[in-house]
From Swiss-Prot:
InterPro entries documented for this protein: Cyclin-like_dom (IPR013763), Cyclin-like_sf (IPR036915), TFIIB (IPR000812), TFIIB_arc (IPR023484), TFIIB_CS (IPR023486), TFIIB_cyclin (IPR013150), Znf_TFIIB (IPR013137)
GO cellular component: transcription preinitiation complex
UniProtKB keywords: Repeat, Transcription, Transcription regulation
Gene Ontology molecular function: DNA-binding transcription factor activity; TBP-class protein binding
Gene name linked to the record: tfb
Thylakoid among keywords: no
GO BP annotations listed: transcription preinitiation complex assembly
Domain of life from the UniProt record: Archaea
Pfam families: TFIIB (PF00382), Zn_Ribbon_TF (PF08271)
Transmembrane segments: none
Each Sequence repeat, start to end: 126-209, 220-301
SUPFAM superfamilies xref list: Cyclin-like, Zinc beta-ribbon
Protein name, UniProt field: Transcription initiation factor IIB
Family membership: Belongs to the TFIIB family.
Length: 310
């Protein structure tokens, strides 16, 4: 291992390791940055079950320490929560004890988030969960988005800014990191702040947290847009061919992948006689008509695509 490749010692911890480079080493119980070799977090308890389980009862009995750690809670979910309905043996509580347990649960919720940052993170967790469910995204996006939001909160980036917009920006960043094909317009549709504010917060997060965003292949957007427009598999295949050709010629770098996918679908639909308007395609892709029109002109000209008379 060369000097440049050697992992940093734990005492030389570098702040702000990009989330997409953080992996969990199950054997050592550590979160490690694959970019620098830095141990981001150590002595993490392995929270999964020890053996295979085939029934809910077996899973409960064989799990060592309960639920896994989560970024959606200020305390990472380490603390237990008072049950409001059953005792330690699983028996239902009588009415008087249920009322008392409910009061204790409310008190515990207040005590759990003690600082303003923790309270903000708790509110953000609810908003991020709402966004992920509204957009029908994989549940894993919640943890990635919360990791990003938590870093932003700890750096003071959320102060004075809309919690909704910052949460939406974190969700968009998480989608980019995990390769989920969603445009910023898709996400802005389910928040009050609007696209411009979400985009501003996203740029702030990427810049200040020094996130390295992977380039999203526009081909990944094609299937979802084609399905929304009820176009044929032939259109999907042809649009993908156009995008592969565009990538080889260097036409996709720095362009919105959703806009490129929309333009390629528009061209493919024209070629195969399954016409859709630019307005329809833009709406399905979550981009503007202007974006579709500009990318369409560019692809047709640079790739020398002959089109039937419109």
């Amino acid at each position: 291992m060369t000097k440049e490749q050697a992992p940093r010692a734990s005492g030389e911890k570098e702040e702000g390791c990009p989330p997409e480079y953080i992996v969990f080493d199950e054997e050592r119980g550590e979160y490690i940055c694959t970019l620098t070799g830095e141990v981001v977090e150590e002595t993490v308890i392995d929270t999964g079950p020890e053996w295979r389980a085939y029934t809910p009862e077996e899973r409960t009995r064989r799990s060592r320490v309960g639920s896994p750690l989560t970024h959606t809670l200020p305390d990472y979910g380490i603390l237990t929560t008072i049950s409001g309905y059953r005792d330690a043996n699983g028996r239902k509580l009588e009415a008087r004890l249920r009322i008392e347990a409910s009061r204790l649960r409310r008190l515990q919720a207040k005590l759990r988030a003690t600082t303003s940052i923790e309270k903000n993170i708790e509110q953000a967790a609810r908003e991020i969960t709402r966004l992920v469910e509204a957009l029908n995204l994989p549940r894993g996006i919640i943890d990635t988005a919360m990791m990003i939001y938590r870093q932003a909160a700890e750096k003071g980036l959320v102060r004075g800014r809309s919690l909704e917009s910052m949460a939406a920006a974190a969700v968009y960043a998480a989608c980019r990191i995990r390769g989920i094909p969603r445009s910023i317009d898709d996400i802005a549709e389910v928040v009050k702040g609007g696209r411009k504010e979400v985009a501003r917060c996203y740029r702030l997060i990427v810049r200040e947290l020094k996130l390295r965003m992977p380039i999203v292949d526009p081909v990944r957007y094609v299937s979802r847009i084609v399905s929304a427009l009820r176009l044929s598999p032939a259109v999907e295949r042809r649009a993908a061919e156009i995008l592969v050709q565009a990538r080889k010629m260097g036409l996709t770098a720095g362009k919105d992948p959703a806009g490129l996918a929309a333009a390629a679908i528009y061209i493919a639909a024209l070629e195969l006689g399954e016409r859709r308007t630019q307005k329809e395609i833009a709406a399905a892709a979550g981009v503007t008509e202007v974006t579709v029109r500009n990318r369409y002109k560019e692809l047709v000209q640079k790739l020398n695509i002959p089109l039937p008379a419109q």
